[in-house]
Curated annotation (Swiss-Prot):
Gene Ontology molecular function: any one: catalytic activity
Matching SUPFAM superfamilies: DNase I-like
Source taxon at top rank: Eukaryota
GO biological process per UniProt: 3'-UTR-mediated mRNA stabilization
InterPro entries attached to this UniProt entry: ANGEL2_N (IPR045816), CCR4/nocturin_mRNA_transcr (IPR050410), Endo/exonu/phosph_ase_sf (IPR036691), Endo/exonuclease/phosphatase (IPR005135)
One Pfam family matching this protein: ANGEL2_N
Cystine pairings recorded for this chain: none
Stated family: Belongs to the CCR4/nocturin family.
Listed name of the protein: Protein angel homolog 2
Amino acid sequence: MEAWRCVRRGYGRCVVGRGRYPMLPHHQKSLGRDWTTPWENLQKCCWNRHISSCMRWPGHYSRAPYPYFSSRHFSLNWRPPGLFESRAPFQYWNWRPDSLSQTSLFHLSSYIMNSEGDEPSSKRRKHQGTIQRHWEYICNHNKENTKILGDENVDPICEDSENKFEFSVMSYNILSQDLLEDNSHLYKHCRRPVLHWSFRFPNILKEIKHFDADVLCLQEVQEDHYGTEIRPSLESLGYHCEYKMRTGRKPDGCAICFKHSKFSLLSVNPVEFYRRDVPLLDRDNVGLVLLLQPKIPSATSPAICVANTHLLYNPRRGDIKLTQLAMLLAEISSVAHQKDGRFCPIVMCGDFNSVPGSPLYSFIKEGKLNYEGLAIGKVSGQEQSSRGQRILSIPIWPPNLGISQNCVYEVQQVPKVEKPDGDLTQPELDKTEVLVTAEKLSSNLQHHFSLSSVYSHYLPDTGIPEVTTCHSRSAVTVDYIFYSAEKEGVAEQPGAEVALVGGLKLLARLSLLTEQDLWTVNGLPNENNSSDHLPLLAKFRLEL
């Protein structure tokens, strides 16, 4: 008899062909999620000899949930239960995207074995490694000469300030469980047990405890988990927590948490990007802006403005992303504006769903953007082709949004009122608002902050891109920590026209990794890292 042969098609799917025998029925041709051959034929049709030992029952059951394979009684149209049901069906070894090296030809499904001892040795190695990240200490003696030190000791020349306030900031997209389950196709490479919240949350909390940041900016914080687990756990670690849930029926939001011992809270300012009266703004993303006062017993220090957001993902809606960013910058401008007309230092964190070098990223760093002729799908840099995409309109958002092209709240001119004694007076403007004159239609956007990125996004020695997220479909940088650098640490930017009270000096950052690094531990999430994003972490000094 001529043996069945397998022809590889696509990701993890094999199609069974035949020699001189009739074709199988259509519903029995796929060996993926839809069916499994009888055990005897499965051994014949598979070129990978590990298949005979790869199927096991996870855990210890008093009675197996399904019978073992038999050519007499196994149903060819059997379908496994849902990915996140409480009881697991049989499981197979790991799947990886075709763009990366694979050692086994035959991959059946995303149901992964629990027992690492039963996996092929080439796959077992993935589950034994851990991510190695280290602190990179940075000293800016001047903007032309920046040192990055890879050891555990800070450059002594950096320790030159007597009046200083040092603090650390973490930005972390912790991956909402509901979003994980709604987008399970992004996690085909994962072993199923590592995707359960009961496994993931202890790992996430362990990371937070280990790094012990003074300020946490968290994204994709699921509301029910926040109330029952996340907030109580963080409060027990000495954090004060503020949370803004996404609008509509979205289950998650953004949180900013800070150590009681380091800061006191001056104001909380949530930002909703959904506006019923603006058709463009029909998405439920949010931001959160806090004004924090450093606790320094013997010195007077400026406040610090901390912002956190998660912008829209959709790569083809750059107009919405830019408008959401402008709304966040307008709120930051309002909150950070001091009574003396200057602005306090700013830290802006989040998942911006935009890649380094994209127009949106460049706008944040350079303070200006001319978007005339820019395709809507090119704004975030996630789309490689702009064919069939419309051009950004001028202006991007309508006047009734109340935000100028300088990304500040517009203040309407109030008509002068005549007092009974004949004097003409005008109500005094709120000092936290910025007066903006009427502007002609322009394709130029600006903001008034000198913002730098904590990370350079490429390895200094090789130029290989760093990544902050890595799953079955993508590995790229979308998460950032931006900060208002002291004047000596950043070149003057065209949009930066405001005076700052002090400035932030970047002392150190936790190193990032490459896509290749992450796939050595089977991508994200994995046994030790329970989000599909890496936490970003930076240490700053506020000069007093």
